[in-house]
Amino acid sequence: MAELFRPVEHERLAVEEWDESRAEEAIRVIVADTEATFDGSRWPWHPGDGEEDEDPNDVYFGGAGVIWALHELGSTGWEDAALTFIDRQRTRPVLDEFTVETSYSFGELGIDLVAYRLTGDAGVADRVHDLVLAQPDSEANEVMVGTPGSMLAAEAMLAWTGNQLWDDAWNAASERVEAARDPDGLWTQRFGAEEARYLGPAHGYAGNMRAFANRGRAPEPANLEPHLLREDGLANWVSREGSRPDEIRVQWCHGAPGMVATLGDLLDLELALAGGELTWRAGPLAKGPGLCHGTAGNAYAFLVLHRRTGDELWLDRAHAFALHAIGQVERERAAVGRGRYSLFTGDIGVALFLRHLLDGEERFPTMGPFDP
């Protein structure tokens, strides 16, 4: 029997009756704490996010992602902070292939995009445009670092401005991404001497397809059967071609939750349901409540399936994961003595998921489609 998930990476689901006011209060507490903890320059680093970064500015770990979420949650007054993050990022050395200036999640591109959303500054828009067109030789081929992320940035700017310039920029980026596709429909991600072919939304196929599908231009899907694990009505996808059995994941970034949340409208319905069922059976993630590899991120798969099928079962499951994620936020805050301040791994991402759940919204943050 194939191992579709590893129980040690999951928790027993907390049994709690759904209460909308509990979710609203959790949002209020998280937003208030996040606003109050900002020291005018940054939020404190969390030990769960690895080696401390003195000045985290980016969308994934840093301040830009936090203020993106705060803005979406109705918090105001972050324009100066957004511009500060840009200035600070431009003086930082590029540490590795992930922090290049054209990176959507870890570099200047995403920070500039957030700053434009908050300020409408024409100079910032020009810089976003330059960065979108600055990746002709990128071999990252993933949304977080490579040209697919430039597609998302151009799509967002088109939605926010209506300017044809951004349609042209999107087309230029999309042509590069399509040209980089492998004959079997996957993409190869290359970072220095390292090479892999990932399946999930953060680093591979699903995210790239989403960047096309947001505008109704998804190319012919790849045959993912060689990378699919099935058993008793459940389904999961390996994280990358040739993954070892002990590398199986059930997360947004890698595995069934992210594949369903990102490609739920493109997948065969039976397969999407099998991926959702696997996500439910595996249970909340022990890694924490966040978006990238946490309980809230996994629950987006349920929201997508609820929208696609109309079956209230999936909404009930999203409610259950939401309550569990709230409990995880509260326990972690008590253990560490403060919150966790990042969009993809922290509390504010959970708050944004809760807002989406309450508002009937299933779009995963930063992945589009984007509203005007």
Feature locations, PLM:
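Terminal, non-catalytic domain-edge segments
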Residues: 1-36, 214, 265, 304, ...
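Low-complexity, Ser/Thr/Pro/Gly-enriched N-terminal "stalk/linker" regions
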Residues: 1-63, 68-84, 168-183
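Well-ordered alpha-helical segments within folded domains of soluble proteins
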Residues: 6-9, 56-72, 102-117, 142-158, ...
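Structural helix-adjacent loops and short alpha-helical linkers that scaffold large soluble proteins
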Residues: 13-28, 70-83, 116-129, 157-171, ...
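Structural signature of alpha-solenoid helical repeat scaffolds
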Residues: 18, 51-54, 58, 96-99, ...
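Long, well-ordered core segments of solenoidal/helical folds
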Residues: 25-42, 79-98, 122-140, 169-188, ...
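Extended ligand-binding clefts on enzyme/binding-domain cores
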Residues: 164-266
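Loop/turn-rich, solvent-exposed surfaces of beta-rich toroidal or solenoidal domains
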Residues: 279-314, 321
